[in-house]
Amino acid sequence: APARRVLPVFVFDDGADGGRPPGGARRWWLHHALERLRASLSERGAGLILRRGPTLATVLSLVEDTQAHAVYWNRRYDPAGIAADSDLITALRERALEAKSFDGHLLHEPSRLTTGTGGPYKVYSPFWRALAASGEPRAPVAAPKAIRPLPEAVASDALESWSLLPTAPDWAGGLRDAWTPGEAGARQRLAEFLDARLQHYAEGRDRPADAVTSRLSPHLAHGEITPFQIWHALNRPDLDTPARDLEKFRKEIAWREFSYHLLFHNRDLASQNVNRDFDGFAWRPDAGLLAAWQQGRAGYPIVDAGMRQLWRTGWMHNRVRMVAASFLTKHLLQDWREGEAWFWDTLVDADPASNPAGWQWVAGSGADAAPYFRIFNPVLQGERFDPDGAYVRDFVPELARLPNRYIHKPWQAPADTLSEAGVKLGATYPVAIVEHRKARAAALAAYDAMKGTR
């Protein structure tokens, strides 16, 4: 039988379905990802139709225009996406059309893994054990060599009309230097990781200056590579990789799965504390402190390096994400939702599950969260994970000439050392906006006060 005609479509609801519109960094990525997807489909004989608007109305309009008799799409897992998908299936089936959604985003459906009592997991370790015992995820499917298009043209939005790219100012230069959006870029990133970095992953993944992490997160977030493609690639017989590195990386993939499990069972994960005790936490809103953190002017080099890496490249090393998030919520007592919103706007891998789950984990309000009294000392974190200061020197160049012993605590450097390095605290580099011991004491006092009001 001849192949059925296929019309590839990308529907950009941009918040019209009730979900969160993508932030600036993801909008930049989306523009380039769609350009590359369009080129890839063209090589296979098909075009890419772009439509912007609510999913239901947009798809039904296309169905009417094309007289389509079947609609297939990749399933969504954010609350608004789940609701929109459900409405779409109902509407299509009411019209006697075939409607199917597919699991292109996760290893397992978020509802599949349950505890012994049939409930959701709230702790990562047993979730990981259940996932590891659930068998191999399905094998990836190869892309078709050719697609049989519709004989007649179908109206499409012009990608440029969506205005996804920054213009005044164009802040995306660092993103262009750092990333290659699209499926080909994802495949190249995975190949480089497997061939050169995976064998150092378990030992080196916490050192931000060492390029041993996969940096696949933005490709995963945009559906350019799937977790089961990555999972099965780890089974390659020619990989000469120690078992501990393989397991550690698989566990990081499982953290992403766990985040979606949490989102599925906590639909307001980005706006409400999972641990409702934190509803009584006395955050201290301060626009000046928040801005200093956002702009990499906190006066703690490892924190500032992370925030500047984020602004320059749209990405931040995971260890530094934890340190920067802890600093905002515990040293500065700013609501985790402020930090989550900033990451949502500036990360190319901003994810509706991983982003809020990570912030709640650090803040202490989430499922399986780090204890609130675990307050990262940014100096010690820098000295442990960036011992020679290479990461700080890259993103905080005004400190580059400081000796290693002072690179994470410039305020302890003698005056002549600062002078020789061209550093003038309060002028060329900010004075620390809080003192660690005082900030830690204030955070613990706020936590004790919250516990006293329960």
Segments (PLM) and residue ranges:
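Trp/Phe/Arg-rich N-terminal binding region typifying the photolyase-homology
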Residues: 1-139, 143, 354, 445-450, ...
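Generic alpha-helical segment signature
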Residues: 30, 183, 209, 296-299
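Short, contiguous clusters of charged residues that form electrostatic/catalytic patches at enzyme active sites
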Residues: 32-35, 57, 301-308, 441
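Generic hydrophobic alpha-helical segments
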Residues: 59-62, 190, 306
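Glycine/tryptophan-enriched, flexible segments
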Residues: 118-277, 386, 390-454
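Active-site-proximal binding-pocket segments
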Residues: 211-398, 404
